[in-house]
Amino acid sequence: MKIEAVVFDWAGTTVDYGCFAPLEVFMKIFHKRGVEITAEEARKPMGLLKIDHIRVLTEMPRISNEWKHVFGQLPTEEDIHEMYEEFEEILFAILPYYATPIDGVKEVVSSLRERGIKIGSTTGYTREMMDIVAKEAEIQGYKPDFLVTPNDVPAGRPYPWMCYKNAMELCVYPMNHMIKIGDTVSDMKEGRNAGMWTVGVILGSSELGLTEEEVENMDPLELREKIEVVRNRFIENGAHFTIETMQELENVIEHIEKQELIIS
């Protein structure tokens, strides 16, 4: 078994430690309408196409009930599109500041390329958003061989289409010769649905939701508990492997190749 390509997620996996760029924007657009949502609620759908993310938030029972209390009715598609337009406007302005590669990513990608492994990527951001993020990340030294956004395929995560398009453009087949790595539940489902080896990265992830400073200063036992919660969540949603940092990815690749594992 030879791993020929790795498909990385972006925010929370390769850039934007903790995936904070969209978080406060989601909270802000609801707050503006008198509906308060928590950071935990805002993170739950992370990884989806952003308009789908907003739609899922409006469908959460507590949020939909609070919306109904404020407006006397449940959110409509018009409300969702209106919030999405505001979301885009705010996010576009801040995205350049959230495109810094996470520590270790550039070195791991360079090492993978030395092994002949191709580098693909998928995202929950739109093409317009990624034009900003990818440009800034490239300036800072990170550029995958290929990028697919939900705009390029019939549907985003958890559907496998973005991974399939990466496979076609990178000329890799069968799908079990590829790894999908990400930091959200939707990443795990995307990779599994595509028939790929699926890896969840924990530190820096949206699922963990901590800044680098918080990780460094947290009580080790408390941090370990939080890490294990995320690890279990990834496994429950299809991850074949979990890693705490990107530097562990090559160990996973060697394990798959040496053990000649078969996707179950």
From Swiss-Prot:
Keywords: Hydrolase, Magnesium, Metal-binding, Schiff base
Disulfide bonds: none
The EC number(s) this enzyme carries: 3.11.1.1
UniProt KW Transferase keyword: no
GO CC field: cytosol
Cofactor: binding details: Binds 1 Mg(2+) ion per subunit.
Active site annotation, chain numbering: D9, K50
Catalytic reactions on record: phosphonoacetaldehyde + H2O = acetaldehyde + phosphate + H(+)
SUPFAM superfamilies: HAD-like (SSF56784)
Matching InterPro entries: HAD-like_hydrolase_sf (IPR050155), HAD-like_sf (IPR036412), HAD-SF_hydro_IA (IPR006439), HAD_sf (IPR023214), PGP-like_dom2 (IPR023198), Phosphonoacetald_hydro (IPR006323)
GO biological process, alphabetically ordered: DNA repair; organic phosphonate catabolic process
GO molecular function: magnesium ion binding; phosphoglycolate phosphatase activity; phosphonoacetaldehyde hydrolase activity
Positions of Mg(2+) binding: D9, A11, D183
Cofactors demanded by this protein: Mg(2+)
Function: Involved in phosphonate degradation.
Family per similarity comment: Belongs to the HAD-like hydrolase superfamily. PhnX family.
Subunit structure, as described in the record: Homodimer.
Name of the protein this chain belongs to: Phosphonoacetaldehyde hydrolase
Classification lineage: Bacteria, Bacillati, Bacillota, Bacilli, Bacillales
